From Swiss-Prot:
Record protein name field: Putative uncharacterized protein DDB_G0282129
Biased composition (Low complexity): 40-61, 143-161, 301-311, 325-344, 353-373, 414-428, 438-485, 495-504, 513-526, 668-745
Species for this entry: Dictyostelium discoideum (Social amoeba)
Stretches the record annotates as Disordered: 9-61, 128-164, 265-289, 301-373, 409-526, 540-560, 668-765
Top-level taxon: Eukaryota
Transmembrane segments: none
């Protein structure tokens, strides 16, 4: 319905005294032409341009000319990434209080409204004959002024009547449209839900012509939208007649009341597409809307949101726009529409929605709630199965990773084995193992031609602050253990035998490693280095003894003994090989988590506790605390540099003191005998006096003793490693007897160093 009438008070011809404010009216009036309403689309500017910027502006302008001018730059388009579609959810209705006021005014002013309607019809016919639509020319200004003068008194007397009449018409129209639309939507929603539950294999075709009237700020936008996509905008906004603020508040209030009154808003979608019946209900349709609002060809905002629904949602796929006539179906296109139950938030104000035709792909259909539940149950079952499979795989991987081997410490020299102080790994469940068997079931971790730079199995320890350069990478939780079974070498020595001769630990361990790997393949058991505690695992069988070339007596003695010897030699070699006179020997009384061999952190010994000076003489403290001079050190070093064997504690003083078994064997400066922890030919000089006590397997013909830790010390350039300090000031190449690693500045005589793999509260097995 079109409303054409004259607009009074343009600010030039009518004085301000003629304008009367009606306190009952919700609108406020102003006569200032400079305060332009932001939603009036600069009507005054357009009129001024048409009048060649003269001050004489006609006092009356027809609404048809205003609407034609103001409606052009206002455009609203809704686009989709897939075929375009329109979903309108907002049907603004005025508030109840305002409706009551307007109804009272309507009863009092019915006669005046009829007269004004007749005048408007006559003026509309005259204006259509006299002037064009888009422009206001000088030729028509005289006729417009005459018409304005004729109706000037009526306009001034009934200024509020225009507003009330117009509001009453809009109120009636809004109420009727809202009631009709609500009834239609309820009927369509009921019919569609019934058809979906009964037969989902049939195509639902519904058409609807939706008329929506929005009370936008700055005026009334009457939008008549149909299938033909005709959009007629009528704007009664005059120059500064209404203030934007009050009208915006009224619109927002009405919109909030509508949204609060309805839990679920229903809207229809006009679709022109081919939708084949779906015999299967196992599919769903989702619609994603992208709303783009433009004014004067400028994009104000763009909103993209999926349409949430309580029943189902719609998706149009593929994203390309498909012409309905180009679809592979042979059936002709037919009109169809989808009724969508949405609970999405309302669109922004001042966004008149324009319905467009959509093309729906053949892959879309509806999904039933029962099927959705079935799908959810199936997905949950699949997720549970996947989690179980992942857990099983993780367990298998952990079992495979826990297959460890110790360092190949064979020296390929003679019948005896040089027991290098390479402490085997003591990994726990919290730390992954470091070593595994190769494909040929042989231990090739530390071969000379190993390209993995595993000089001492430190390649996996680069980012670990507790680097165990002597295969102690995973000894963090074994707070009180060096090899889980530290033994006293004196307990295993005969009275007539000064040292313990061991079998070839490499070949023996290879054989047991092969056997244990076969057991892993059969029983999925974990070969862990902690199993060395169990003597039943390490004892050879009769068949294995027959295959072994060495005598049975030596084989029977191998298990804990050799492993424990390694730890003994490691402790002795640590003290012997620290040659840097400027470095200090760290003493950590409380931290049992530091690993032996963690040279990158200068934590060289674990569980180094201080004891009273009664355990060791005061002269021992002088040497341990660094008070010995370099001359004395050079003397003792040269005296014992080429000695391969030194007897261990001839008096056997340590048998009765298990916790302090190393104490009296470190140094005894009262005599010329320095008791080293060693056995027969264990400190093999390799004919060059560069004894890699921790790296006898990684010399690689390199006399520089940097094979132990140089490859993996990422963050510490000043590593107090076992073999990185050969180029000291003394130029002493003898690693066995280098004792210049203590702090000469330390003068403490009240404590001595005690090396114990166990805390004082635990006793050794």
């Amino acid at each position: 319905m079109k409303f054409d009438f004259l607009l009074a008070n343009d600010g030039n011809n009518i004085p301000n005294k003629q304008i009367k404010e009606d306190k009952s009216s919700p609108y406020e009036f102003t006569s200032n032409p400079n305060k332009l309403d932001p939603y009036s689309n600069n009507i005054n500017n357009n009129n001024n341009n048409n009048n060649n910027n003269k001050s004489s502006i006609p006092s009356s302008v027809s609404l048809s000319s205003i609407s034609s001018i103001s409606s052009m730059p206002i455009s609203t388009s809704l686009s989709l990434s897939s075929p375009s579609i329109v979903i309108s959810n907002n049907n603004p209705v005025l508030s109840n209080e305002y409706q009551q006021q307007q109804q009272q005014q309507q009863q009092q002013q019915q006669q005046q409204q009829q007269q004004q309607q007749q005048q408007q019809q006559q003026q509309q016919q005259q204006q259509q004959q006299q002037q064009p639509v888009k422009t206001v020319n000088k030729k028509n200004s005289k006729s417009n002024k005459s018409n304005a003068n004729k109706n000037n008194n009526n306009i001034n007397n009934n200024n509020n009547n225009y507003t009330s009449m117009y509001d009453n018409k809009i109120q009636q129209q809004l109420q009727s449209i809202y009631k009709q639309q609500q009834q239609q939507q309820q009927q369509q929603y009921q019919t569609q839900t019934q058809t979906q539950t009964q037969t989902q294999t049939q195509t639902q075709t519904q058409t609807q012509t939706q008329t929506q009237t929005q009370n936008s700020s700055g005026g009334i936008l009457n939008i008549n939208s149909s299938i033909n996509n005709n959009l007629n905008i009528y704007n009664n906004t005059s120059s500064n007649k209404f203030k934007h603020q009050h009208n915006q508040q009224a619109y927002n209030q009405n919109l909030s009341e509508i949204n609060n009154s309805r839990n679920v808003t229903t809207s229809s979608v006009n679709a022109n597409s081919n939708i084949n019946p779906y015999p299967n209900s196992n599919s769903s349709i989702n619609i994603t809307t992208t709303t783009t609002t433009t004014t004067n060809n400028e994009i104000l905002w763009t909103t993209t949101k999926p349409t949430s629904s309580t029943k189902h949602s719609v998706i149009l796929s593929p994203p390309k726009k498909i012409d309905s006539y180009d679809s592979p179906q042979s059936s002709p296109p037919r009109q169809s529409s989808l009724l969508i139950s949405t609970s999405s938030p309302p669109s922004p104000p001042l966004s008149p929605i324009q319905p467009t035709n959509i093309v729906q792909s053949s892959s879309s259909s509806f999904s039933s709630p029962t099927y959705i539940q079935q799908q959810q149950q199936q997905q949950q079952q699949q997720q549970q199965q996947q989690q179980q499979q992942q857990q099983q795989q993780q367990q298998q991987q952990q079992q495979q990773q826990q297959v460890e081997t110790v360092n190949n410490i064979g020296n390929n020299k003679s019948n005896h084995t040089s027991l290098t102080p390479n402490l085997t790994s003591l990994s726990t469940k919290d730390y992954p193992p470091m070593y595994s068997l190769n494909n040929n079931n042989s231990i090739n971790i530390n071969n000379n031609n190993n390209n993995n730079n595993n000089n001492n199995n430190n390649n996996n320890n680069n980012n670990n602050n507790n680097n165990n350069n002597n295969n102690n990478n995973n000894n963090n939780n074994n707070n009180n253990k060096i090899n889980n079974n530290h033994f006293d070498l004196n307990d295993y020595q005969d009275d007539n035998q000064s040292s313990y001769s061991s079998p070839d630990i490499t070949t023996t361990h290879n054989r047991y490693s092969q056997q244990q790997q076969q057991q892993n393949n059969n029983n999925q058991s974990n070969y862990h280095i902690d199993h060395l505690n169990d003597k039943s695992i390490m004892k050879p069988t009769k068949k294995q003894i027959k295959k072994q070339s060495q005598p049975q007596e030596k084989l029977s003695k191998y298990s804990e003994d050799q492993i424990h010897e390694e730890s003994e030699f490691l402790l002795a070699s640590i003290l012997l090989n620290l040659k840097d006179s400027n470095s200090t020997l760290p003493i950590n009384n409380n931290n049992y988590n530091n690993n032996i061999g963690n040279f990158n952190n200068s934590t060289i010994l674990k569980n180094i506790s201080t004891t009273s000076s009664d355990d060791i003489g005061s002269s021992n403290n002088d040497y341990i605390n660094g008070s010995i001079s370099n001359e004395q050190h050079q003397y003792y070093s040269n005296k014992y540099s080429n000695q391969n064997y030194v007897q261990i504690d001839e008096n056997n003083n340590n048998k009765n003191n298990k916790n302090n078994y190393v104490t009296n064997n470190i140094v005894n400066s009262n005599t010329d005998n320095y008791n080293y922890y060693s056995s027969h030919n264990d400190f093999d000089n390799n004919n060059n006096n560069n004894n890699n006590n921790n790296n006898n397997n990684n010399n690689n013909n390199n006399n520089n003793n940097n094979n132990n830790n140089n490859n993996n010390n990422n963050n510490n350039n000043n590593n107090n490693n076992n073999n990185n300090n050969n180029n000291n000031n003394n130029n002493n190449s003898s690693n066995n007897n280098s004792r210049n690693n203590y702090n000469n500045n330390s003068k403490k005589r009240s404590s001595s160093v005690q090396i114990s793999p166990y805390p004082p509260s635990k006793s050794r097995i």
